[in-house]
Amino acid sequence: MKPFLIFQGPVATRSGYGDHSRDLLRSIIAMNKYDIKVISLRWGNTPMNALGPDDSDISSLIHTQGNLPSPDVFVQVSVPNEFQRHGKYNIGITAGMETTLVHQDWIEGCNRMDLVVVPSEHAKNVLLNTVYSKMQDGKEVDKLLVKKPVEVLFEGVDTDTYFEIKKHDYQKLGDATIKESLDTIPEDFCFLQMGHWLQGDHGHDRKDIGGCIETFCKAFSGRSKKPAMILKTSHATFSILDREDMIQKVENIRAHFKDAPNIYLLHGELTDSEVNSLYNHPKVKSMVSFTHGEGYGRPLAEFSTSGKPIISTWWSGHKDFLKHSVRLVGQVGQIHESAVWDKVIIPESQWFYVNYKFAQKALQDMYSKYTKQKELGRRQKYYITNNFDLKTMDKKFVELFSKYVPKPVSEMALDLPSFDSMELPTLQKAGE
């Protein structure tokens, strides 16, 4: 009989945590060692329609009614302040933190688990380096810090889903909807920026989408020939109101510039196949990210498979895998009060700020010297597909289970003591 494992996470949501949850769950299923049940949770306001007919391997395991017995292994994918013990052995998996500090509730949550798994060295270091003092009568009586083991397991790229489509193959392999939409763009050179446009004043939302748009406009406004930007973004929903709000935000920035370059908003749900077609469309030449911080940076990893160059900040989680890119300089500084998120992004923490003047030049160089810059994309594609793919992640996950998760009694080797050989006396019948 296989040991019982409960996997709890946002497996049905269209979110970064949802993507990661599905990858991890499939990795555990492939181990073929556990009787698995899944508790599917919401993730903010993100849609819960990510599981389709081809995802029966996951949907068939989702528990819908009644109580479940306490499992041998409990795996929870969430933010650490929500971590709870429900099994004999408990694993908490989180994307970690994009800043330099975590809230004390995160530390307490990590200490409730037996093992904590994060996707990057940055996330691990932030958890282990955040220390709070416990005070009593004005004196420090103890320290609050993570005492449980923290291991890094990167978010592997599914190279069967994300892969390079050569220009001459795009007509055959590219998604028709994406092709039709982007073919109408008159510009032949487009930068791609993607990610949720989160809370924060201008320049202080976590992805710094506003700052990137402004820098792009500064770089190319007034030029007779200029590139465009494709912006794939939303708040957390794909509603009409959300779309109109995104359009207004973009126009509010462009209005400050005369003859600004075009910015095309891509808003709404995309399948993985559509996203890969977006990355590979011949008009999309480069991805750009001014992100203040990433726990990992999954879109940057997935875009790498296209073989096209990336312009990005060089701080936090994506440093692990983004070896060949245009690295934007800047400095680490205090987060703005408008970006504070209760018990998640705390006011005492810091993150990265791009040097906009340097970034403006980087955008201009990517446009004017693209032939030279393409070599970065080719090198990065080779690096990501050989070191950070899904199969390599699966292998490491198996190693973590073998290292930390106690084996069931049925799998344990029984070491019996050895005895010297013994000679038994010869028995004789009575009377002989």
Which positions does each model-derived feature cover?
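Donor nucleotide-sugar binding/catalytic pocket of nucleotide-sugar-dependent glycosyltransferases
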Residues: L115-D175
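Extended catalytic core of nucleotide-activated donor transferases of GT-like folds
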Residues: I6-Q8, N45-L128
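Conserved catalytic-core segment of nucleotide-activated headgroup transferases in glycan assembly
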Residues: H20-R22, R26-S27, D35, D158-S277
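Short alpha-helical segment that forms part of, or immediately flanks, the ligand-binding pocket
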Residues: N276, A301-P309, S316-D320
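N-terminal pre-catalytic "stem/leader" segment of glycosyltransferase-like enzymes
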Residues: M1-P71, C217, A228, K395-V398, ...
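C-terminal amphipathic helix plus adjacent low-complexity
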Residues: H235, W341-E432
